[in-house]
Amino acid sequence: MAAQGYGYYRTVIFSAMFGGYSLYYFNRKTFSFVMPSLVEEIPLDKDDLGFITSSQSAAYAISKFVSGVLSDQMSARWLFSSGLLLVGLVNIFFAWSSTVPVFAALWFLNGLAQGLGWPPCGKVLRKWFEPSQFGTWWAILSTSMNLAGGLGPILATILAQSYSWRSTLALSGALCVVVSFLCLLLIHNEPADVGLRNLDPMPSEGKKGSLKEESTLQELLLSPYLWVLSTGYLVVFGVKTCCTDWGQFFLIQEKGQSALVGSSYMSALEVGGLVGSIAAGYLSDRAMAKAGLSNYGNPRHGLLLFMMAGMTVSMYLFRVTVTSDSPKLWILVLGAVFGFSSYGPIALFGVIANESAPPNLCGTSHAIVGLMANVGGFLAGLPFSTIAKHYSWSTAFWVAEVICAASTAAFFLLRNIRTKMGRVSKKAE
């Protein structure tokens, strides 16, 4: 009876979060999707467009960090649903606006609301799934972004051409509002909310003094493993962003390839990333099922290191072997391999940061490593392009390659340090 109950609620809750987060991501990109139609009606230059999109990016980075902390303090169900409601309302108001300052202000609010989406998902997944299932379902949930990112441009373009860009934003916003209330009804924070026994993924310390055993924020921040994960995530996300943002320019400007090959490389990278995310979750869950969580080391480390090494090798081959005469298939293979090797670790860092933290601080832990990833994404922008400007794209990619190799080597040396963050009882030690 209990097993059927868990299965039913897991299916309903996961489906609600998958659909809800697909809408989160679609409505994060709606401005980009309808941009061609919008500029036909309202003349905006590149600076205006950049200002509007940058306002959202800055707000999203801040909000995602704050939301991670809030998910440890309040209901994840309410946080997720409230954010989706706000995203929908902002898109509706955006549809009836016409000036750059209003566009930027509303898209900043969109960014703030967007940050409320993912951290509650991680919190709910950890409460409802065993450690040996957590990585797989985390990875599958993350593919909601690939789904929205793949179908979104086509759907938005068809709607904008058939009706208008305003109708597209208003319709997608209204759908968010409706689904936000459905998510509030269907998502439950933990099994106890529906009369089922809570899962306990962490080693039990006994009921007596359990509240005293809760770790503090200071103890979490003093855990060396938190900063090992944060540094690794910064490097992996930064290097991945280098390739996704500048890979096309490198191929076209320095390797003499066509724009079509450049865009095809990006598509291959995203397809490889989709497969890599799911594979990383599934394979690392199998390792977790065999070995289980411990205070030192993590069964997911082996796959994480393998994929980080794959990133380094594929970047080296991309930089050294590609020429103007290279077979197109070889370039696509390199893109797919890099996508597979980079999106896998991105999924794993989030999973490990969540499961290695104390239950009362797992959202905060994920928020911290996620913030460091955003720092990596920032470094992949102007600093990376500055190196390319003063030297060459090849030199810039060589720097990223060396940093990735050094990070992989350092993570290998530190793979068996204490991985349980926060307070550890004397018995566990």
From Swiss-Prot:
InterPro entries tied to this protein: MFS, MFS_dom, MFS_trans_sf, OPA_Antiporter, Sugar-P_transporter_CS, Sugar_P_transporter
Pfam hit, one: MFS_1
GO BP annotation list: gluconeogenesis; glucose homeostasis; glucose metabolic process; glucose-6-phosphate transport; phosphate ion transmembrane transport
Molecular-function annotations in GO: glucose 6-phosphate:phosphate antiporter activity; glucose-6-phosphate transmembrane transporter activity
Annotated compartments: Endoplasmic reticulum membrane
Stored Gene3D superfamilies: MFS general substrate transporter like domains (1.20.1250.20)
Known outcome of mutating G149E: In GSD1B; inactive glucose-6-phosphate transport
Entry's transmembrane regions: 84-104, 105-125, 139-159, 167-187, 219-239, 260-280, 302-322, 329-349, 368-388, 394-414
Notes on activation and inhibition: Inhibited by vanadate and chlorogenic acid.
Tissues showing expression: Mostly expressed in liver and kidney.
NCBIfam families according to UniProt: 2A0104
Protein role: Inorganic phosphate and glucose-6-phosphate antiporter of the endoplasmic reticulum. Transports cytoplasmic glucose-6-phosphate into the lumen of the endoplasmic reticulum and translocates inorganic phosphate into the opposite direction. Forms with glucose-6-phosphatase the complex responsible for glucose production through glycogenolysis and gluconeogenesis. Hence, it plays a central role in homeostatic regulation of blood glucose levels.
Family to which the UniProt record says this protein belongs: Belongs to the major facilitator superfamily. Organophosphate:Pi antiporter (OPA) (TC 2.A.1.4) family.
Protein name, UniProt field: Glucose-6-phosphate exchanger SLC37A4
Species the sequence originates in: Homo sapiens
